[in-house]
């Protein structure tokens, strides 16, 4: 595997923009691009982006301008992934590595089905407190990219990605059990994303001991843990507590993506979270009342947009 020299990012929300900012600062604007379809390009090409209050010049390209990338980071919403597959195709070359920052547990499968499993390294992005409104990104905690492989044949590409991230001081970890990490993050999102949206609060609200948002968050996470265990993923109460503690370390004023969706009146990823828990609970014969409540409440909120 050759050295990674250029990066293409799909998705220019909070995570994608933050990753682009961090990487561009290290390898230069000419080596980092945001790839988007023509409609999104026309909407964003003249926008003034700001990162933590300062203007920042990103390079945005269309599929017609795209060239094969050494590394592609997919940071769309889960709801936008299938559409993004066509957009990113011109950037996928023979040696391209693809990693996904998308929530949920199936984005790697979708990417591998389209572009080949030999290109996809499993990843989880966690611990960020990025918020993105308009074209302005604000964050204090850059978080960490957790990386891992399921197929040992991918070891060489994982080592190349590890070397690249080390060379630019990009915070990441190499996971021995990436599947466990992916499902752990899913458990967290089921709680924190949905509770923050429903109760219109940020990380501060769900970190307050005894508060209703926190109680609902933890209850939803326990239901996610239950169905994950039934699927053969051994999530534990210690995993749950660790993620709850992680949320308390984030900026109290910041909020996860679903809470931002409510502010921006955008459709959320509730199907990915409560929807998945409910479907798996039905499959295994469980009841998950907290997620059923959250699903119903999010549907009511979105119906009012």
Residues covered by each model-derived region:
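NAD(P)-dependent Rossmann-like dehydrogenase/reductase catalytic/cofactor-binding core
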Residues: 2-3, 30-31, 218-305
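Nucleotide donor/acceptor-binding cores
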Residues: 4-5, 70, 143
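Short, charged/polar "capping" segments at the starts of alpha-helices
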Residues: 40-45, 108-109, 155-157
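Internal alpha-helical scaffold of NAD(P)-dependent oxidoreductase catalytic cores
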Residues: 90-91, 114-119, 134-237
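Residues at the C-termini of beta-strands that transition into short coil/loop
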Residues: 36-38, 62-64, 102, 124, ...
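Short, well-ordered alpha-helices that flank and scaffold nucleotide-derived cofactor binding pockets
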Residues: 21, 25, 86, 90, ...
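Rossmann-like NAD(P)(H) cofactor-binding subdomain of soluble oxidoreductases
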Residues: 52-136
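NAD(P)+-binding Rossmann beta1-loop-alpha1 motif at the extreme N-terminus of oxidoreductases
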Residues: 1-58
């Amino acid at each position: 595997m050759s050295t990674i020299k250029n990066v293409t990012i799909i998705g220019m929300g909070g995570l994608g923009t933050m990753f682009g900012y961090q990487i561009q600062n290290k390898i230069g604007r000419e080596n980092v691009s945001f790839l988007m379809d023509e409609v999104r390009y026309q909407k964003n090409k003249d926008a003034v982006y700001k990162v933590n209050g300062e203007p920042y010049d990103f390079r945005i390209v269309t599929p017609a301008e795209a060239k094969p990338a050494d590394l592609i980071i997919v940071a769309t919403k889960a709801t936008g992934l299938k559409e993004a597959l066509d957009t990113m195709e011109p950037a996928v070359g023979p040696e391209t590595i693809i990693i996904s920052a998308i929530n949920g547990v199936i984005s790697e499968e979708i990417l591998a089905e389209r572009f080949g499993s030999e290109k996809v390294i499993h990843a989880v992005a966690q611990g960020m407190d990025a918020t993105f409104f308009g074209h302005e990104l604000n964050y204090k905690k850059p978080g960490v990219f957790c990386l891992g492989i399921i197929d040992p044949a991918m070891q060489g590409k994982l080592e190349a990605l590890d070397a690249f991230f080390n060379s630019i001081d990009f915070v990441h970890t190499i996971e021995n059990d990436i599947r466990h990490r992916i499902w752990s993050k899913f458990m967290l999102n089921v709680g924190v994303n949905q509770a923050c949206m429903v109760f219109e609060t940020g990380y501060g609200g769900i970190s307050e001991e005894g508060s209703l948002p926190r109680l609902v968050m933890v209850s939803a996470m326990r239901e996610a843990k239950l169905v994950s265990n039934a699927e053969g993923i051994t999530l534990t109460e210690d995993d749950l507590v660790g993620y709850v503690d992680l949320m308390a370390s984030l900026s109290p004023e910041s909020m996860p993506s679903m809470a931002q969706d409510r502010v921006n009146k955008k459709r959320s990823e509730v199907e990915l979270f409560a929807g998945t828990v409910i479907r798996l609970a039905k499959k295994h014969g469980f009841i998950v009342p907290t997620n059923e409540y959250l699903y119903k409440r999010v549907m009511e909120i979105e119906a009012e947009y």
